[in-house]
Amino acid sequence: VTFGVAKPCHLLPASEAAVGRLTIIDIGLDSADRTAVVERLTADDVAAAWPVPTAASDKYSRGVLGVVAGSAAYPGAGILCVLGALGTGPGMVRYLGPAAVAALVHVHAPEAVTATGRVQAWVLGSGVDPEDTDDEDQVRWIRQALDSDLPCVVDAGGLAFLAPRTAPTLITPHAGELARLLTRLAGPGESEVTREDVLDRPGEHAQAAADALGAVVLLKGATTLVVSPTAHGRPVRSQADAPPWLATAGAGDVLAGILGTLVAAGVDLVDAASVGAFVHGLAADRANPGGPVRALAVARRIPWIVSGVLAGLYTG
């Protein structure tokens, strides 16, 4: 139980596990003129931020997402990323990847387009091995997207190609990936950042990456953090909407697709990361409440979660 408003210790990874069920008692404090340090979105916030089409919308105005994901070693990543994107409600998804993976994508998602063309945002790197040079086209597509002025959601193997860019950039590492990224950005001769370092001080390391790259960082974990560059002056976002069962292979690929659709629709990166994490977590919870959940089941549940959020079925 706390009074007035939630405190940072109630919402941040280092201490949230000890909080249990949080009850906030209103004691009449006026916090309207105070700037939050940490924010957490509710279902009502998510509904307000969600991009809803109108009668005047077409597939291009709703957002066309390009996806460079999946590989011979990890074909499922391409499929799951595309399904996550499609379930979130894009105008179109263009998939670029190995021909064998593209064929599998078409089996699971015949509406996906496997040809180049205009896009409004990219998802890059899910299931891509940066050390595998067999598919030169895929590496070229990732580099070209990062060199463009289009918004990019960069996940997994795509992080190995990332340098500071001026275009909108959202990265989605887990602790190990963030450690490797920070070590690379620091350069030779600097101390290695380890996964344990990130887990001990997640907010600090996410902030370091955000400042170094000029990017929004979604650091995945039991409590997901969304951190923007210090110069932007925005509070940290903290979402803890997913069950522990979501710690499973492919879940991050689905999340990357969700985020890509939101970014292609023009949603602000911090909002896209936060509402995407909320819907991803709730989809996992509702796919099989209280039990194991597959990433594919999460992807298939997304449209129902979105409609439920917009209908006000999940209060708060």
Residue ranges, per PLM feature:
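Small-residue (G/A/S/T)-rich helix-start motifs and N-terminal tracts that mark the onset
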Residues: 5-170, 175, 180-316
